[in-house]
């Protein structure tokens, strides 16, 4: 049995540990720069735009989590949910926690009138791909994910900064400060 609940500030150490565990599984053990302070601020600060949902067993032990935020479909005219991370501890896999977390996000989307729940998965992660397909999710074969990050982001973005303003920018570009963004890139249009 899986108990699903919103994350609370006391969950931050467990969430951060599972983020590190996920990075290790995804062969990027040194890529995590997140800290308890950053995670606490983004999840529980004054105006949170990123959310975490916890899965526990009947004894109250944390078995997994989902970290997600809203995206927007220009074609549908409504929000969707982007699932940034879904992680279930290895010893708890097969107990229904991952399915329960995804069902909770799907129910949240349905209840709020959102258009979809979407996420990215590494192409070599066959166990997850098969799990998602069994739930009825389908890969978006015609889409490729692009990302600007690190040096490429700095090189591309720096020339536009002149005296603290964006030159040639869209008038709404200033609204980007603090807006929710997919750290894995703009994975889907619409």
Residue spans for each PLM region:
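A short beta-loop-alpha structural element at the N-terminal edge
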Residues: 3-15
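Conserved GNAT-fold acetyl-CoA-binding loop/helix
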Residues: 16-41
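A short helix-loop-beta-strand connector motif used in the catalytic cores of GNAT acetyltransferases and
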Residues: 41-54, 82
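Conserved beta-strand in the GNAT
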Residues: 54, 61-70, 82
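A short, internal acetyl-CoA/4′-phosphopantetheine-binding micro-motif in the GNAT/acyltransferase core
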Residues: 86-93
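Conserved active-site alpha-helix within GNAT-family acetyltransferase domains
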Residues: 99, 103, 111, 123-142, ...
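Conserved GNAT acetyl-CoA-binding A-motif
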Residues: 110-120
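Terminal substrate-recognition subdomain of acyl/acetyltransferases
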Residues: 134-135, 144-172, 176-190
């Amino acid at each position: 049995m899986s108990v699903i609940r919103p994350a609370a500030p006391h969950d931050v150490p467990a969430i951060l540990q599972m983020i590190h565990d996920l990075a290790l599984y995804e062969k990027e053990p040194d890529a995590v720069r997140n800290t308890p302070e950053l995670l606490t601020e983004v999840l529980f600060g004054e105006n949170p735009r990123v959310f975490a949902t916890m899965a526990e067993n009947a004894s109250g032990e944390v078995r997994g989590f989902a970290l997600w935020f809203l995206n927007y479909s220009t074609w549908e005219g409504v929000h969707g949910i982007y699932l940034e991370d879904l992680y279930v501890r290895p010893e708890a896999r097969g107990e229904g926690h991952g399915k329960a977390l995804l069902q909770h996000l799907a129910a949240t989307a349905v209840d709020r009138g959102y258009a979809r729940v979407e996420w990215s998965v590494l192409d070599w992660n066959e166990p997850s791909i098969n799990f998602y397909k069994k739930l009825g999710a389908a890969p978006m074969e015609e889409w490729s994910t692009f990302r600007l990050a690190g040096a490429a982001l700095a090189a591309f973005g720096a020339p536009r900064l002149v005296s603290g303003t964006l030159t040639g920018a869209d008038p709404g570009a200033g609204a980007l400060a603090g807006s929710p963004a997919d750290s894995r890139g703009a994975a889907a249009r619409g």
